[in-house]
From Swiss-Prot:
Gene expressing this chain: tufA
Compartments in which it is found: Plastid, Chloroplast
Known EC number: 3.6.5.3
GO annotations of cellular component type: chloroplast; cytosol
Name the UniProt record assigns to this protein: Elongation factor Tu, chloroplastic
Originating organism: Costaria costata (Five-ribbed kelp)
Length: 235
């Protein structure tokens, strides 16, 4: 459930597979779900390389992953696959926080991974000119400030002081945006693609549920009937 919620907002993803163990059952599920919710680009990181003595085993895991990706209509032959050890890199940084690129091979492998992400996953084109819309992923209260709805802005721009509609369960409610925050920074506005927390005036936490949306007033109509395509996962 949590993976689907996060993946549905992604412009790209890093698929982490153990180089020591190879693809696991959940690897297949993650690839399937990524495809079905529309994750457009994937980069693969074969982790725990430090636990593998035979490089041929790493190459075998890479072939397995490429075949698995191709089976779900991802370009398995073209997707970048990087190797490394997240734990070794983390330990190196913790032991010597001033490490620079070129000082440690495990840290360098993480740099290489992020360079592949930057080069392979294109910068998405955002719908900033369309009316504001954000699906609510979570909601919580801040003592002394009010109620905050979090999520990724799908389109448009929202500014502090603007009126927005809360659409979904029950009657549509209007409220005023009193704050926009992203990664603990206060903003004047949020734009399409931003993962933000929006502080709302006059609403209680119980008024908002995950799955409701915030929108520019009058631009969204809720529906009781719709057609869908379902993918059922067994335990």
């Amino acid at each position: 459930k949590n993976m689907i919620t996060g993946a549905a907002q992604m412009d790209g993803a890093i698929l982490v597979v153990s180089a020591a163990d190879g693809p696991m059952p959940q690897t297949r599920e993650h690839i399937l779900l990524s495809k079905q919710v529309g994750v457009p680009h994937i980069v693969v990181f074969l982790n725990k390389e430090d636990q593998v003595d035979d490089l041929e085993l790493v190459e075998l895991v890479e072939l397995e992953v490429r075949e698995l990706l191709s089976n779900y209509d991802f370009p398995g032959d073209d997707i970048p696959i990087l190797t490394g050890s997240a734990l070794q890199a983390l330990d190196a940084i913790n032991n010597e926080p001033t490490l620079k690129k070129g000082d440690n091979k495990w840290v360098d492998k993480i740099y290489s991974l992020m360079e592949s992400v930057d080069s392979y996953i294109p910068t998405p084109i955002r719908d900033v000119d369309k009316p504001f819309l954000m699906a609510i992923e979570d909601v919580f209260s801040i003592t002394g400030r009010g109620t905050v709805a979090t999520g990724k802005i799908d389109r448009g721009i929202v500014k502090v002081g603007e009126t927005v509609d809360l659409v979904g369960l029950g009657d549509t409610k209007s409220t005023t945006v009193t704050g926009v925050e992203m990664f603990q920074k206060t903003l004047d506005e949020g734009v399409a693609g931003d993962n933000v927390g929006i502080l709302l005036r006059g609403l209680q936490k119980g008024d908002i549920e995950r799955g409701m949306v915030l929108s520019k007033p009058g631009t969204i109509t809720p529906h009781n009937t719709f057609e869908s395509e379902l993918y059922i996962l067994t335990k």
